[in-house]
Amino acid sequence: MISVVKRPERRYFYETNGSAISKESFRIVREGADLTAFTPEEAQVVVRMIHTAGDLDLPRRVVFHPDLVSAVRGALRGGAPIFTDANMVKSGITRRRLPADNEVRCLLRDERAVALADEWGTTRSAAAVSL
């Protein structure tokens, strides 16, 4: 038998549209963060970093190599894979926004990373870099 669950009564208003929530969240980041030290292209990256970390003070600790943004864009357009050491990050990457259907990999749970980490006395993240 399937039990019927009553929908809870809404006692206050909150945004339920995911797109609107995201748009407002990025607006808050852009308005609240000091991005003056960055080029417009770098600022786009920093805004995403802040949004992910939830830290408006993050820009004080970010430095870019002058060629970083163009190098990364070129690599992605060329089909370079994206490696991360967090499955949550992998899940959060919007694949349709990638320019070349880039592969997104996280080797944190790869048995080879687990074995190397144990053998080398390091973390799985550090070991995965060698795979």
Locations of regions flagged by a protein language model:
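Electropositive, gly/pro-rich neighborhoods at or near active sites that engage anionic ligands
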Residues: 2-83
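Short glycine-rich, polar/acidic loop-and-turn segments at beta strand-coil junctions
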Residues: 53, 86-88, 108
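Amphipathic alpha-helical interface surfaces
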Residues: 68, 89, 125-128
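A generic local secondary-structure boundary/capping motif
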Residues: 71-73, 95, 131
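Internal active-site segments that recognize and position negatively charged phosphoryl groups
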Residues: 78-100
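Long, charge-dense
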Residues: 97-131
